[in-house]
Amino acid sequence: MPPDPLLDEDEQYASSEDSDFAPDDAPNQASDQSDVEDEKDDGDKSTNKRSRPAADEGAADAGYDNSGDEAIIKRGEKRRKKTQTRGVNEDEDGGEGGLIKTRRQRAAEKEERKYATNNEPVTIDVDALWAQMISKTPVPGTKVDEPTDTDTNTDPTNKKVASAVQAAGSTDSDDASAMIRIKRTYNFAGRVHTEEKLVARDSAEAKLYLASQGDVPPTEGPEKRATRKAFRSAFEPQVDLMPQRSDLNLGMAARIKAGKEVQAKKLNVVDKSRMDWAGYVDKEGIKDELALAGKSKDSYMAREDFLAKSEAMRDEDSRRARLAGKV
């Protein structure tokens, strides 16, 4: 088999004899290409850097007079806008992880925002408020007029007014305690009588009542408030509007009345005449005349006539009471 001519040529070929063979020039060419690319990038950056100073110089000139607070305020406004837009986006998009919020969750979030801290700028003058607190001056609109002793002592009209007020208070208290309420239930001539009247404390009836009660005036406590019924539901039947059966009472009203009659105090003719006489004295207004007649020593005949008339009046009252009892 004849030898392959191509293989022979490869074996006989020497790369060093080739005119294009330059192993030292390859890294130089690669470095040249990288240098060209770096120069292009540096050129672009330098153009960008050179074009920026115009805008930067304008911004610096615009904010030359600013003290720095304006920038802080602008930053705060930007943050608030971001939080507001973020909250709107969260409400529209949903919760975390893309979950859809229900109406209840949104309502709860709105309620929480109502009680959230207020980040708005403060409008109150803190320095003026602090100075006012230190000076301890009264807040306008809360004046309290306190009467001083010097004014009351120097002004005679104030003394008169004070004395008049004290006199009025004493008369009011006297009027309140000068009246007494008489309430009694007694059994006379087979009938139960109930009386309730308001009379003067120094009247004959009041004195007789206090004497019968053992000089102990009745203590009237505060009236008890009636118990309120619970509100009726719209679904409950109206039982109260239904007619009640009278035959189911079984004479309870009569029993209660009989119990009161048993508890009533029984009066004889003398006690009833004494009560009627006290009422007559108060009605005719002869209390002072009786007091004068009792103190005088020279009117023996007048006293005898007066006692005779009184006895006749008592007999007439007792006779009428007996006739009323028989009927």
Curated annotation (Swiss-Prot):
InterPro entries annotated for this entry? BCNT-C (IPR011421), Swc5/CFDP1/2 (IPR027124)
Residue ranges, annotated region (Disordered): 1-122, 136-174, 210-230
One GO biological process term: chromatin organization
Pfam families reported in the protein's UniProt record? BCNT
Compartments in which it is found: Nucleus
Report biased composition (Basic and acidic residues) as residue ranges: 106-115
**What highest taxon heads this organism's lineage?**
Eukaryota
Per the record, its GO cellular-component terms are:
Swr1 complex
List, as start-end ranges, the regions of compositional bias called Acidic residues: 1-23
Establish whether keyword Transcription regulation is in the entry: yes
Domain BCNT-C: start-end pairs = 247-327
What keywords would UniProt list here?
Answer: Activator, Chromatin regulator, Nucleus, Transcription, Transcription regulation
Q: What does this protein do?
A: Component of the SWR1 complex which mediates the ATP-dependent exchange of histone H2A for the H2A variant HZT1 leading to transcriptional regulation of selected genes by chromatin remodeling. Involved in chromosome stability.
Give the protein family: Belongs to the SWC5 family.
Q: Partners and quaternary state?
A: Component of the SWR1 chromatin remodeling complex.
Protein name in UniProt: SWR1-complex protein 5
Per the UniProt record, the source organism is Gibberella zeae (strain ATCC MYA-4620 / CBS 123657 / FGSC 9075 / NRRL 31084 / PH-1)
Q: What is the lineage of its organism?
A: Eukaryota, Fungi, Dikarya, Ascomycota, Pezizomycotina
